[in-house]
Regions:
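Hydrophobic alpha-helical segments
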Residues: 1-118
């Protein structure tokens, strides 16, 4: 269940961080291993709401993108909205932790100018 959502979180967090290495790496996983089409990939890069996920997963994705872009903008209203979509606190935490870890990876790869090796 979580393979596509996790790869989508990594991809779209990397888009916000302008990490070309991770964008291309995660795009490759989505396209070559998880069945996402090139059209779906481009659509979700333009707007996370276009990701080929169910509503619960999409809500978590949009929340993570908001939080990694401006963590101070997250409020209890956001958390309650996720809970109303049947997201557990563990799922909310796990999704955001996944996104936050991706930010740190993006920073490292960008700072050290790591070139694509794939």
């Amino acid at each position: 269940m979580w393979y596509v959502p996790y790869s989508t979180i990594r991809l779209l967090v990397s888009v916000t961080q302008h990490c070309e290495y991770c964008i291309d790496f995660n795009a490759g996983i989505l396209l070559n291993q998880l069945g996402v089409t090139p059209e779906q990939l481009e659509a979700m890069k333009q707007n996370p709401e276009n990701a080929p996920l169910n509503e619960k997963e999409k809500s978590l994705l949009v929340f993570v993108i908001k939080a990694v872009s401006d963590s101070n903008s997250v409020s209890e209203v956001d958390i309650q909205a996720l809970r109303r979509k049947d997201c557990t606190d563990l799922e909310i935490f796990d999704a955001l932790a996944h996104g936050a870890r991706q930010v740190s990876g993006d920073i490292l790869l960008n700072a050290f100018k790591v070139e694509k090796d794939f």
